[in-house]
Curated annotation (Swiss-Prot):
Keywords: Amino-acid biosynthesis, Cytoplasm, One-carbon metabolism, Pyridoxal phosphate, Transferase
Membrane spanning stretches: none
Protein name as annotated: Serine hydroxymethyltransferase
Entry cofactors: pyridoxal 5'-phosphate
PROSITE patterns in alphabetical order: SHMT (PS00096)
Enzyme class: transferase
Localization, UniProt: Cytoplasm
Keyword Cytoplasm among record annotations: yes
Gene from which the chain derives: glyA
Organism encoding this protein: Mycoplasma genitalium (strain ATCC 33530 / DSM 19775 / NCTC 10195 / G37) (Mycoplasmoides genitalium)
Length: 406
């Protein structure tokens, strides 16, 4: 049975090695994180929190979880942190359970404009259990309009406002969001899943001084294992937040992942991480600017983060063409989208993964030129084949997980 899994593991390893990954929410963890995630800690059940478990034999995982908590607090300047959420969605759900009652009003960014499913989408728990109201981007600039957000907040009086997004390429002014939340007496949640790496590196405003609670994933720009975290400096709500995670929406935490989160936080505390995040930002800007110069429509006319969206007409077709050429990204809706989410107008491009492999600005500009050729060829098979060859030749200079095999 394991031979079948081993075959798939090696197949996936080869796929990752031979593809250019431009999916903004993906990255490559270190081999240390791979090792810890696959460690014996996966065997330990540990409901509860350090020193307050419902199982015996938790003395070791108490230590590892405390290490993760303290390093997370140090990395972000937080007074309190919970490292148990299985994902960013779980973290958001726990916050809602802690601070809201079913039917309460929440205010988040519209999904088509870059919001997340858990920010009030009608197909998600956040839109089913709560009264979800959305704000949009400015139609002309495709950026946040804080005055318009204030007017919506004043009209609907939400109990919770969510800032932080899954597809927004500009910086977020958490101080302005804080002023809005205070005017309507709402809790303020910053979902920093995509920009956590920039905040940790000091390259983006830290939300903690301005918001009630922060949620994040650990596997995007933080370059850690798949998981979630919650942080807060609001002492009045931290017990509620702990209860929102356990027993609110989770049972036993994933101790092997929590230990890997600790490794992730320690890696991000290394001064080299700031250099990495600056390169991520430089690479995204160089790529976006190249597309702009070629006459493409880039949403919000650029980027200040690790990602941007390109308007290509039929995002699904373009994503499939590029996949055949070993360039992997995702189709995505654009602001004020008129087409289906299953066949949207745009594609989303991100730079964290390939920056981890060593790509610099010139490499991303070269990749942009390859994407341009495939798009302009309308998916011509000869062009796709030529592009795939160019990709494989390029990746020879950027090996991934040397010596690793299953």
């Amino acid at each position: 049975m394991f031979s079948k899994v081993r075959l798939l593991l090696n197949k996936e390893l080869q796929r990752q090695r031979e593809n250019i990954c431009l999916i903004a929410s993906e990255n490559y963890v270190s081999q240390d994180i791979l090792a810890v995630t696959g460690s014996v800690l996966t065997n330990k059940y540990a409901e509860g929190y350090p020193s307050k478990r419902f199982y015996q034999g938790c003395e070791v995982v108490d230590e590892s979880e405390n290490l993760a908590i303290e390093s997370c607090k140090t990395l972000f300047g937080a007074q309190w942190a919970n490292v148990q959420p299985h994902s960013g969605s779980s973290a958001n759900y726990a916050v809602y359970l802690a601070l809201l009652k079913p039917g309460d009003t929440i205010l988040g960014l519209d999904l088509n404009c870059g919001g997340h499913l858990t920010h009030g989408s009608p197909v998600n728990f956040s839109g089913k259990q709560y009264q979800a109201v959305t704000y949009s981007l400015d139609f002309e600039t495709e950026t946040l309009d804080y005055d318009a957000i204030l007017q919506i907040a004043l009209e609907h009086k939400p109990k919770l406002i969510i800032c932080g997004f899954s597809n927004y390429s500009r910086t977020v002014d958490f101080k302005k969001f804080s002023a809005i939340a205070k005017q309507v007496n709402a809790y303020l949640l910053a979902d920093i899943a995509h920009i956590a790496g920039f905040i940790a590196a000091g390259l983006h405003q830290n939300p903690l001084p301005f918001v009630d609670v922060v949620t994040s994933t650990t596997h995007k720009t933080l370059r850690g294992p798949r998981g979630g975290i919650i942080m807060s400096n609001n002492q009045a709500i931290i017990k509620k937040l702990d209860s929102g995670v356990f027993p609110g929406c989770q049972g036993g935490p994933l101790q092997h992942v929590i230990a890997a989160k600790y490794v992730c936080f320690k890696e991000a505390l290394n001064p080299k991480f700031k250099q990495y995040m600056q390169q991520v930002k430089d690479n995204a800007l160089a790529m976006a600017n190249w597309f702009l110069k070629q006459g493409y429509r880039v949403v919000s006319k650029g980027t200040e983060t690790h990602l941007f969206s390109l308007v290509v007409g039929n995002g699904k077709d373009v994503a499939l063409w590029l996949q055949k050429a070993n360039i992997v990204l995702n189709m995505n809706t654009i602001p004020f989208e008129t087409k289906s989410a299953f066949s949207p107008s745009g594609i989303r491009l991100g730079t964290p993964a390939m920056t981890t492999r060593g790509f610099k600005t010139n490499d991303f500009i070269f990749v942009a030129s390859l994407i341009d050729k495939v798009i302009k060829s309308n998916g011509n098979q000869k062009v796709i084949s030529q592009t795939k060859t160019a990709v494989l030749n390029l990746l020879k200079r950027f090996p991934l997980y040397k010596g690793l095999a299953y």
